[in-house]
Amino acid sequence: MFVRLTLADVKEGEMNNLLNYVKNSVIPSYEGLSGLLGIAACSTEDGKFMAWSTWANEGAKEASIESFNQALAGAMDMLDSKPESMEGPMVAGQTYVLVPKDGEEPFLARFVIGSGTQEGKTYDDVADFMTNTVYPAYESTEGIFAAGACKTGENTGFSFNFWTDTTAVENARPVISEVVSSAVSELISEEPKEYSGVCNIVKNYVDFPVGKLSDLNS
């Protein structure tokens, strides 16, 4: 699996217009793209626009670049500056409940972007930490339904976790804080940046079954 994440600053008063543009224009324009597994967008708690798409592999994502560029061109008048995009293969992931195709229930999306690993560590070490420490810890929480980590470079990447609502995340804060603290002390160079927001715009094209998200690669 391969994920592309886009973050952007939006002109004042344009956020709802931008989200409606994604819902009514971008998502329909992506219909039928080979290898597209899902697409979603939201406004973050600090006022940024955040969108992400999930693909079967990098080749499928690359084949969609014309559609992506057309979507970006249509959004530029609503943006304050050129958006920041990052992408990479999913190197760790888990679903805790079935996420069905065409599921469109609102949820809380939380993305975490690291600044890089400590000397002598790589993002593969981060992936192992996510798989063996973070995901088992999340099993004790209520309201989480998916988590993953994507490698953008030898020492860089981003992770995400999806929750039923804001309350679920706040109740899980002790667990989240503990795993972040462990990551900072053992793996990453400094505390990562978190972006989160309630997502009402989502389109899944496949079921995401309970278990390892990376199994969808096989």
Regions found by a protein language model. Give the residues of each.
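Short S/T/G/P-rich N-terminal loop/turn motif that feeds into the first structured element of a domain
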Residues: 1-50, 54-158, 162-218
